[in-house]
Design a protein with these regions (language model features):
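Short, Lys/Arg-rich, polar N-terminal cytosolic tail immediately upstream
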Residues: 1-6
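A structural signal for multi-pass alpha-helical bundles of membrane permease subunits
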Residues: 11-303
Length: 303
């Protein structure tokens, strides 16, 4: 009996060993290496960088550009999930529950799901280049062209420091919302139609249907969406780097932590300082995910 238990344990361990080793080598090991490099002055060329302790972090917290990047990431952390989830829930509810009968959704809802999902099949760099043309400050811009034709002054969507951040946020929402429309639509499709029909018989309007039935039953999905979008807001890089002037400009008005990591590592060759930025970003991301899951925890509703 004891021998059989030992063989079973050995069998299970042999299967678990390979994925655990791969995880340690390719996931945990790079994190440990980044933490070590963050405490050195490595510039990418020396084999043995000098250990400088927490000097990179002291310098980091005194860097005004770093605090601008953190401010923009925190603004995205609040606004991107909030706007995206509100819009995605609205469109998903409209496609699945908001039809003439109040239950079946609007006509052609499958086609609209494909249209909403289309931005997800585009590479992020392609989206950034497309919106560079949309936001052009001259008459060839898709937005400024009609404004100038009507005699209005062109808007510096990417050249005005007061507008550029909101332009970046708009592009991020445009790219993300379609996926969550499809995600929430799948969740709504799993809710029995009988619930909506019974609520309508009891006199519930669409406002009550949404807040008393739809949202409570979709809460787990909304919670996961909020975490994913929050991580996206903290990790955003390509849209800012490709689309904006000076890769985070003008005047650092759109820069984010990921852009500063790339700039310091591959333009200034300050890999130690860039790694310190990465460590701070890592703790921001993990802290947000843990806090979100704990704050939004609630009793599961089954149906």
């Amino acid at each position: 009996m004891l021998f059989n238990r030992y063989r079973r344990g050995l069998f299970i361990t042999s299967f678990l060993a390979a994925p655990v080793i791969l995880y340690l080598v390719y996931v945990i090991s790079p994190y440990v290496q980044a933490f070590y490099i963050a405490m050195t002055d490595w510039r990418g060329v020396t084999a043995t960088p000098a250990f400088i302790g927490l000097d990179n972090f002291v310098r980091l917290f005194g860097d005004s550009i770093f605090w601008k990047a953190v401010t923009h990431n925190l603004a995205l952390l609040v606004l991107l999930p909030l706007i995206t989830i509100v819009l995605a829930l609205f469109f998903a509810f409209l496609l699945n529950v908001g039809g003439p009968q109040g239950v079946g959704g609007i006509r052609g809802s499958r086609f609209y799901r494909v249209v909403f999902f289309f931005p997800q099949v585009l590479a992020v760099a392609v989206v950034a280049v497309l919106f560079q043309q949309v936001f052009r400050p001259d008459g060839s811009g898709m937005l400024n062209g009609p404004l100038m034709a009507l005699g209005a002054r062109p808007v510096g969507f990417l050249s005005d420091p007061g507008v550029a951040f909101w332009s970046v946020l708009g592009v991020l929402v445009w790219q993300a919302v379609g996926f969550y429309v499809v995600l929430f639509s799948a969740g709504l499709a799993s809710i029995p139609r009988d619930m909506f029909e019974a609520a309508q018989i009891d006199g519930a309007g669409r406002f009550s249907l949404f807040f008393r039935i739809t949202l409570p039953l979709l809460w787990d999905t909304v919670q996961v969406a909020w975490v994913y979008l929050g991580i996206l807001a903290l990790d955003v890089f390509a849209i800012v780097w490709v689309m904006t002037d000076q890769h985070g400009g003008p005047d650092w008005s759109t820069t984010v932590m990921a852009a500063e990591i790339y700039r310091n590592a591959f333009q200034y060759f300050r890999f130690g300082y860039a790694s310190a930025l990465g460590v701070v970003m890592f703790f921001f991301t993990v802290g947000f995910a843990v806090l979100s899951l704990r704050v939004s925890r609630r009793e599961r509703i089954e149906y």
